[in-house]
Amino acid sequence: MQNFADALPVIRRMLDSDVQAAYDGDPAARSVDEVLLCYPGVLAVTYHRLAHQLYISHVPLLARMIAELAHSATGIDIHPGAQIGSRFFIDHGTGVVIGETTIIGERVRIYQAVTLGAKRFETDEAGNLQKEYARHPIVEDDVVIYAGATILGRVVIGKGSVIGGNVWLTRSVAPNSQIMQSGNNKSSAP
């Protein structure tokens, strides 16, 4: 638990950056206080930052309990094992799912109903479900993922990319790509 206590100043700085990202990234935000007190995405990320520190401090049950409190309160399901960089903003948020081995970089923004999940679950020779392997996406810095997007498997969403609403992805995306739904997913660099 000493690790947890030692990490609190860092967690506080991360949370300050998350609140500022929400305020800066939402034209409807009228004040930092409004963001801090009224935005479910900020509440979910607050719980997550605490739960993640407990998770990496080898207190996984308490971490999962905190994550489930956040899920119940906000409709946002973030596994405490997920690694999330600073200035992270979930706008609206209902239905967001972020899996255990997801890695999210700095200055990432996602919208409601986004799933960062596993594509499949590996088994050993006896058919037993494998655990503790990387199976969720890596989202690099400065990425925006719009409502309803589903990104599955250990794929990389390159820095500066934009993933449009309702896009279904099971492949990696190069930096600065724009992936939109229009019959077929298209990839283009700006």
Tell what function each PLM region has:
Residues 1-68:
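Terminal amphipathic alpha-helical/low-complexity segments used for targeting or macromolecular assembly
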Residues 70-187:
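Structural signal for interior beta-strand "rungs" in well-ordered beta-sheet cores
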